[in-house]
């Protein structure tokens, strides 16, 4: 369930470039998060928000890497959205750990908040 957020405390997004990488898998949940992220960036004054969709959470780090390495259009921040549901095995934990580790390493290496 989405709740309202007070965007008054956010730094201004004016003149900044924001990117959202979102998975298509579990769209029932991810699409709501995507809509809320775009609304929040717009409320903070971001002129545009670039959105890139990928099949699932596993592909998010590859897309984020491509986004931050594009010549001449390095974003100020990248938001990554995906949902991994826990099943009967440890598969979800392995996917989640791998994706978050890859995103952290990318963020540090490229000096871009992800």
Residue ranges and their predicted role:
Residues 82-90:
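Short glycine-rich anion-binding loops that position phosphate/pyrophosphate groups of nucleotides
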Residues 1-22, 29, 66-69, 107-114:
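Anion-binding alpha/beta catalytic cores of soluble intermediary-metabolism enzymes, centered on
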